């Protein structure tokens, strides 16, 4: 960390210094998720998150530079889906830093909506290295691609089409991902964006009728058209690692510096930490940081358990980046003039300026809240609905009817139990509910169970009344998602308290967080 001078990086160099680039390559910072047999570190999601968070406490630009190769990109896609030849060719070079990767998904018109990618690859015959072969002619225009200006290998998402039927009867094969060296003829990189003044490399890439062999498709020709599944599976995991790590770093840094500042900075003859207005903001910073760390640990643990928690990672991405923004706002309010004057000793300015980047990327927060959290969770997390849909789609009608009837009866019983449980818990104030622990946090478990029953009941009612229109009722979906999110964040907080041995010093933060979570859930 002592090698990192964020003011010099952002204001003077507009880039990481060469010695820092070399250090990151040499020490394997770009190979955190690459398997050991290819020279990588094979670190867990928790370790990956911890490293990114530590770097971000010093420099957002340095953290993003390390974070991107270890998130969605060539390294992860090759590890999960690459052929043995592709893995042998690329992973050792990526692990050593000889190759710098980027992944191009976002475009000028479609944004990061993978389903609306306009970039296209047409199956055709052409010459490559003096030999005629079957391949793809790619045309693309991408923007906002981190590391694109310096990348040596480009991961590209595009729509694959076979109008002449060279591969079979199917004309539109769907979203496909390919790996292309950036020195390949026709590939254009180098132009830089300026993401709120931060110094990490971010820019555009284009290509027009660039011919590549079919073997350059990640996973080989048999993975043609399977890019959607690849992107969804990898994005759902990565969304819960990198950006939540940046948000948690903001919390830790703000807590450490602002608590100290509030007691050394004097105003009107007394430390500003003695003013109740400042104490109120400090309480929010400390409690929100506790919440951030709790959610970071639980989310990355789920990813390490191979649960692929797409709903949970959407919750983490949205709420943790929003909490990070809240923490930085409070820290800036307390440190005031010190925070707004940029210079080598200003540790708040750059994290504060970069907040909108975390809010925007990997699914803009406003859409994550209104479309993704409950929109995905209503079906994925329901104990009966997904199974009922699968039963209805079965080809054997007799078997389908028997299966559906059994599920429907179970569903009705489930809804009835939730209705009575929610009503009884509400009337009794959750006093007669059960809890897995005793002591100071016992009531929080009971209250969470009451809200969980109420959410389950409201989910069933919403799905019954609105059916398929529920996803389009974004404001309702957002509020239902808020309840689900508060339950998850509250669970993470209680788990961290238990994991840390029920430390009494943590109890004020736990009480603050849980009171806030329960209030927000009730409000939603």
Q: Which residues does each PLM region occupy?
A:
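Amphipathic, small/basic residue-rich leader segments at the start of a protein or domain
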Residues: 1-69, 85-89, 93-100, 112, ...
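Flexible, small-/acidic-enriched active-site or ligand-binding loops
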Residues: 185-211
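C-terminal amphipathic alpha-helical interaction region
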Residues: 408-524
């Amino acid at each position: 960390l002592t090698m990192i001078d964020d003011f010099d990086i952002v204001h003077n160099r507009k880039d990481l210094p060469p010695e820092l680039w070399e250090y990151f390559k040499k020490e394997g910072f770009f190979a955190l998720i690459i398997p050991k047999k290819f020279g990588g570190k094979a670190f867990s999601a928790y370790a990956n998150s911890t490293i990114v968070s530590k770097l971000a406490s010093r420099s957002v630009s340095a953290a993003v530079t390390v974070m991107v190769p270890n998130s969605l990109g060539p390294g992860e896609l090759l590890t999960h889906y690459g052929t043995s030849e592709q893995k042998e060719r690329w992973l050792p070079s990526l692990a050593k830093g000889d190759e710098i990767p980027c992944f191009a998904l976002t475009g000028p018109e479609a944004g990061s909506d993978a389903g609306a990618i306009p970039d296209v690859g047409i199956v055709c015959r052409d010459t490559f290295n003096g030999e005629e072969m079957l391949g793809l002619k790619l045309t693309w225009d991408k923007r906002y691609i981190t590391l694109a200006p310096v990348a040596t290998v480009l991961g590209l998402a595009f729509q694959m089409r076979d109008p002449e039927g060279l591969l079979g009867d199917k004309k539109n094969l769907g979203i496909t991902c390919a790996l292309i060296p950036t020195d390949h003829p026709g590939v254009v990189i180098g132009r830089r964006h300026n993401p709120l003044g931060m110094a990490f490399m971010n820019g555009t890439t284009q290509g027009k009728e660039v011919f590549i062999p079919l073997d350059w498709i990640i996973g080989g020709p048999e993975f043609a058209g399977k890019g959607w599944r690849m992107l969804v599976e990898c994005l759902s995991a990565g969304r819960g690692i990198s950006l939540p790590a940046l948000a948690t770093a903001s919390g830790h840094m703000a807590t450490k510096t602002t608590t100290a500042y509030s007691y050394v900075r004097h105003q009107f003859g007394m430390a500003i930490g003695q003013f109740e207005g400042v104490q109120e903001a400090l309480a929010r910073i400390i409690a929100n940081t506790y919440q951030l760390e709790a959610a970071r640990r639980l989310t990355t643990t789920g990813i390490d358990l191979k649960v692929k928690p797409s709903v949970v990672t959407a919750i983490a991405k949205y709420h943790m980046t929003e909490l990070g923004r809240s923490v930085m706002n409070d820290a800036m309010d307390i440190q005031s003039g010190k925070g707004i004057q940029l210079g080598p000793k200003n540790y708040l300015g750059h994290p504060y300026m970069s907040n909108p980047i975390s809010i925007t990327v990997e699914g803009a927060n406003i859409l994550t809240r209104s479309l993704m959290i409950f929109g995905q969770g209503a079906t994925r997390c329901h104990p009966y609905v997904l199974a009922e849909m699968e039963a209805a789609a079965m080809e054997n009608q007799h078997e389908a009817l028997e299966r559906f009837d059994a599920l429907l009866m179970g569903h009705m019983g489930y809804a009835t139990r939730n209705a009575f449980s929610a009503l009884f818990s509400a009337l009794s104030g959750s006093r007669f509910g059960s809890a897995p622990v005793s002591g100071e946090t016992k009531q929080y478990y009971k209250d969470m169970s009451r809200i969980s029953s109420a959410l389950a009941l409201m989910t069933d009612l919403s799905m019954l009344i609105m059916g398929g229109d529920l996803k389009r009722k974004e404001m309702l979906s957002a509020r239902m998602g808020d309840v689900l999110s508060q339950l998850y964040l509250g669970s993470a907080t209680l788990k961290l308290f238990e994991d840390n041995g029920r430390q009494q010093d943590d109890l004020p933060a736990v009480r603050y967080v849980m009171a806030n979570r329960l209030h927000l859930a009730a409000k939603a």
